[in-house]
Amino acid sequence: MKNIPVVPAPWLTCLLLASLSLAAQTISVDASHPTNHFVPKETLGAGVDRIAVEAIDKDLLQPTLDKTLASGWQPVTYRQNTELAIEAWHWNPQGTWSDKSDRSDANGKGYFTGSAEPTEMIRYSYGYALPRRGTTRNDGTDNVGFSRLTDGDVNTFWKSNPYLTQHFTGESDALHPQWVVIDLAQVQQIDSIRIAWEEPYARRYVVQYWTGEDPIKAVTRGVWQTFSQGTVLDGKGHTETIRLSGAPTAVRFVRIWMTESSNTCVDSLKAVDSQRAVDSHNKDARDCIGYAIRELYLGTTTPDGAFHDILRHTADQEQTTTYSSSVDPWHEPSNLGSIKQAQMGFDLFFTSGVTRGLPAMMPVAMLYDTPENAAAEIAYLKKRGYPISYIEMGEEADGQYMLPEDYAALYLQWATAIHRVDPSLRLGGPSFQGVNKDIEVWPDANGKVSWTVRFIDYLKQHGRMNDLAFFSFEHYPFDPCRTPWGMLYDEPELVRHITQVWHDDGVPPDMPMFITEGNLSSGASETYQDIFAGLWLADYIGSFLNSGGKGVYFFHFL
């Protein structure tokens, strides 16, 4: 197909202004100096996400599908949704569990790897809620589930991701600190903490409080201050009660920052729950690395030595809120979530006609998965002969509060595994949430706060920039129900600005850049199919391509 030059101006806005003004307007088009070239069959696409099972079947009926395709969107990106809900993705319901002590795959547990061998048609796929979760809620959980850190049950626990330990990264654990944050909802007086450790526990850690308003949403408006007695250099595990300061301190947010693990395993004969009761001769190394906490308690110690806990311990969203750096993707069959919604099965996706037969951008789960499962997924797709354009690695790591060095460490492990299947595959990410400004995180040792700067730095320091074939992010510029017509004038600068931000952060100017989800608002996207949205859409796409973008994907197709 003939390459089409992009008009080097926000032309639709100019037309709108012309229609609103009595004064004559002149639009100059110089086709001899295009700012970009694009091929519509590669550039103008749409996304398919997790939806109701009933909707999947209805939307793929020929009359409905024909109307969908008539919209004109060309390539499709398959969106990865289970990561937003802190779930492990069984992209293939057939597969094997790492722990087969129950003598059958169906009754196994541990780490699941989908079968790479095509057999029965995969029509739907589902997520499994992770039982070692440490986050009460994030931007994708929809207030479903809860943290095991304040659930009131000492037989459950949070555990960090084993793939972020030296065993897999090849780097000191101090370079990938793991953390949990407690949000007290309001400022309260604190001088003591009690930590009920599981194994492995932290040998070295510090307990800190935040000096600003919100360390999750305003990461540069405050600092983490270590309590005067909050440094532990030789932790012993079990249940530790620590007097953090001589006098109570007024705080709202408290963080435990862990830098050295005991790297110890639970004695299977002493295990108090089924998660850890495994045959000691078949012990999985992943169960013995990282950090694990059964329950957290925070409050004050009175002069008589009594500890008074102020946290709310419930197995629901009313618990004291906690956040965690990562989650161990260990799970078992009983953790299957709701089956009313599903990711479309790969075989249904590629044979239904929704892709038009064009190569599709496919995802792999990464934040809550294993590299073996990701590699098996790609092997399956290749054995089926399904065309793949790009592979997007993980979903919205920024919305999961993951530090860039942790994402990068996982990225390289997954890239290695996938490229063993096919070295020619083009991988990318990080599929940021739709934002209009640079994504910032707590400063590193050098004071750097830009997520993208630190991600790119990590790849360069490890000599692996070649594993990043494209850069992806989402674009949802406006809040729902608050989009006056005047905001149409803002869009060209919004998308131009954020594109320039990524380049300023170190994304190479010649690296393909994709907006892999885009609409007016993430909160109410389907309601905007009107004139306002049409005008915005044309301006948004034109401005992004004018800024050098490679492709956009409307969210969403079905």
Model-derived features: positions:
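N-terminal module-boundary/linker segments of secreted carbohydrate-active enzymes
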Residues: 25-58, 408-411, 415-417, 428, ...
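Noncatalytic carbohydrate-binding groove/subsite architecture in carbohydrate-active enzymes
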Residues: 371, 376-377, 404-543, 547
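Loop/turn elements at helix/coil->beta-strand transitions in domains of secreted/extracellular proteins
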Residues: 40-44, 72-78, 250-252, 355-360, ...
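Disordered, acidic Ser/Thr/Pro-rich linker "stalks" and the adjacent N-terminal cap
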Residues: 95-186, 198-201, 221-222, 229, ...
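Trp- and acidic/polar-enriched beta-sheet ligand-binding modules for extracellular glycan
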Residues: 175-176, 199-300
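N-terminal signal peptide c-region/cleavage motif recognized by signal peptidases
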Residues: 18-21
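Extracellular and analogous surface-interaction loops
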Residues: 179-189, 244-249
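N-terminal substrate-binding region of glycoside hydrolase catalytic domains
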Residues: 30-128, 297-346, 354-369, 373-376, ...
